[in-house]
């Protein structure tokens, strides 16, 4: 059995690029806050199947072929391991009592799922769901796979958004801080960032942290967002 691109995500992380969603569609996904919940249901479904539909052969193992995390954060890996091996997951970072992601910002660019504001997604038929994020951040349980599992390393397990190198420390510092990254002061720098995300350009190397836009929102800092390489982690356990 194969899993791939599970992308367990800390959707409240300040080190994300949702504001580039009109350039890169994967920069914001309306369902991303439910990643661990969906993953736990995937595990339950595999456990219920037990064997292949054509061969009727019992599963020997599950192999997940990369991009187990979305943004190479330690907390994303922790949630992924609990999803695969079993355990209680609280899919929340920062403020322990509320959601601090873009979906509660009131910005019509994003899916404001549980408030009354109209947005681009609701205009296309996405529903309003009361108390959605209260349910998202409530503890839930994954049963863990009934068979052994193994995982392969992916680019999202090693780089910011699977594209930008962690050695670019100006952005690296944003992970565990309070400033929500919303781009740079100069449009040329934002264009360079978009190129880096879309085609792996290294043109960000000469951009200084002093040019970051610091007028955006703030979030509650969380040390668990530290990138994996800064924790000495260079892969994931099986």
Pin down the residues of each PLM region.
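N-terminal active-site segment of His-dependent metallophosphoesterases
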Residues: 1-84, 91-116
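Extended active-site neighborhood of metal-dependent phosphoesterases/phosphodiesterases
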Residues: 79-238
